[in-house]
Every structure is written in C-alpha cells, then in structure tokens.
C-alpha cells in the first residue's frame, strides 16, 4: 500500500481526539491527502456498533462480547474506509485501533492480550499501523479532564472505576513492550500546543522515513 497508517492511542481523557484533528488540518494545509477517522466508528455500520458498545445502560455486556464487537466494527471500518484510503496513497490518522482492544479487553478485562490479538488478526489480517502515537497521562488526570468537559457525553468506559483505567494504562505498557518499534510516546499532560508540536514532529519523521 502506498499510504501511511498512523494510529492515536491512549487512556480516556488523554486529548488524542483533539490533537488528531489539528494534526490532520496541518497535513492538509501542507498539501497532503488525509483521512481522519475513528474507532469504533468511522462508517455507518461501525458507528451503529459503537452505539451498542458504549451505551452506558449496557453494563451487563460480557467482556468477550465487547471484544468481538470491537473486532467486528474494526473489520468493517478497515475494508470500507481505511484500506481504500491507503491504496489511494492517503495519510490515515485513526483515533484508536487494535492496541485499544489489547489494552482494554486483553489486559484490563482480563481476556488475555494473546487471545484478543488472535481475534483481531482474523479481523484485520496482516495490516498494522506504520506508527502508533501513545498519549501518556495519569489515569486520575484523564478522569478529571472528562469530568470537567461538559461538552463530552460520558460513555460506558468513561464511567468505569479508577482501577479499570489504571489497568488500561498497564495494558498499554505491556502492548508497547511487545511492539516497541512502532510506538512513539507523547506526554499528554502538557499543553495542547506542546503536545501538537510533538505529534506533528512525529508525523513529519514518519513521512520522511516512508518517503512521502
């Protein structure tokens, strides 16, 4: 594929969604063809699945059901939106991808990273991100940001206890240990301006490495 696939990962409240859109805008201004998208979601079918997964009333959802729904949404999003964009040579910036499932369901939910990776391999095949930008923030700080953001409608994961979010952070640390080559870490506790500068630098380096 001729494009570049960059994913944005991190715990709740890390600010990656805001930075992703700003980075996409900068790339577009610089003359690049960009697709900014998200998981779960990005297309109609996957957005419907997102509504099921994140509905605050669905507290009885089994962890395996949750993992399978994420994988299903990921598959449809991949074949309908991500792969075509990469084949067209676009830069794809995606808010969450497989690493979220590994950290949230594999580690925090206790299903096992290897098991969840296997499920997702069936969904995505061999396609992995070229670069993954991890937004590092203390879980308590992330939750505080969510609580202070009146414009954000809290979803089922936002409402989890602090311990769950701490497990997610540990899960990401384990995932980064397994795939160290493609991860770039950003201190998300900094100002938006500093975080964006760091992210833009990472993306520029990736463009040079891939001769884009």
From Swiss-Prot:
Question: Which terms does the UniProt entry file under GO BP?
Answer: dTDP biosynthetic process; dTTP biosynthetic process; dUDP biosynthetic process
Write down the Pfam families for this protein, in alphabetical order. Answer: Thymidylate_kin
Which Cys residues form disulphide pairs?
none
List the catalysed reactions: dTMP + ATP = dTDP + ADP
Q: Which UniProt keywords apply?
A: ATP-binding, Kinase, Nucleotide biosynthesis, Nucleotide-binding, Transferase
EC number annotated for this UniProt entry = 2.7.4.9
Q: One GO molecular function term?
A: ATP binding
Q: Which InterPro entries match?
A: P-loop_NTPase, Thymidylate_kin-like_dom, Thymidylate_kin_CS, Thymidylate_kinase
Q: Which residues bind ATP?
A: 10-17
Q: Can you list the GO cellular component terms from the UniProt entry?
A: cytosol
Which family does the similarity line name? Belongs to the thymidylate kinase family.
Annotated function: Phosphorylation of dTMP to form dTDP in both de novo and salvage pathways of dTTP synthesis.
Q: What is this protein called?
A: Thymidylate kinase
List the source organism: Bacillus licheniformis (strain ATCC 14580 / DSM 13 / JCM 2505 / CCUG 7422 / NBRC 12200 / NCIMB 9375 / NCTC 10341 / NRRL NRS-1264 / Gibson 46)
């Amino acid at each position: 594929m001729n494009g570049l696939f960059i994913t944005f990962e991190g715990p709740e409240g890390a600010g990656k969604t805001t930075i992703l859109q700003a980075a996409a805008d900068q790339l577009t201004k610089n003359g690049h063809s960009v697709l900014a998208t998200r998981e779960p979601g990005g297309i109609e079918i996957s957005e419907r699945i997102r509504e099921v997964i994140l509905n605050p009333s669905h507290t009885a959802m089994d962890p395996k059901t949750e993992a399978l729904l994420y994988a299903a949404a990921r598959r449809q999003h991949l074949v309908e939106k991500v792969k075509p964009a990469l084949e067209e040579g676009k830069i794809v910036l995606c808010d969450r991808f497989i690493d979220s499932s590994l950290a949230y369901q594999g580690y925090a939910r206790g299903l096992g990273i290897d098991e969840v990776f296997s499920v997702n391999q069936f969904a995505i095949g061999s396609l992995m991100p070229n670069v993954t930008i991890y937004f590092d923030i203390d879980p308590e700080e992330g939750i505080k940001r969510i609580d202070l953001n009146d414009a954000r409608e809290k979803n089922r994961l936002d409402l989890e206890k602090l311990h769950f979010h701490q497990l997610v952070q540990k899960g990401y640390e384990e995932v980064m240990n397994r795939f160290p080559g493609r991860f770039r870490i950003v201190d998300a506790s900094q100002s938006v301006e500093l975080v964006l500068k760091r992210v833009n630098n990472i993306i520029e380096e990736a463009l040079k490495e891939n001769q884009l």
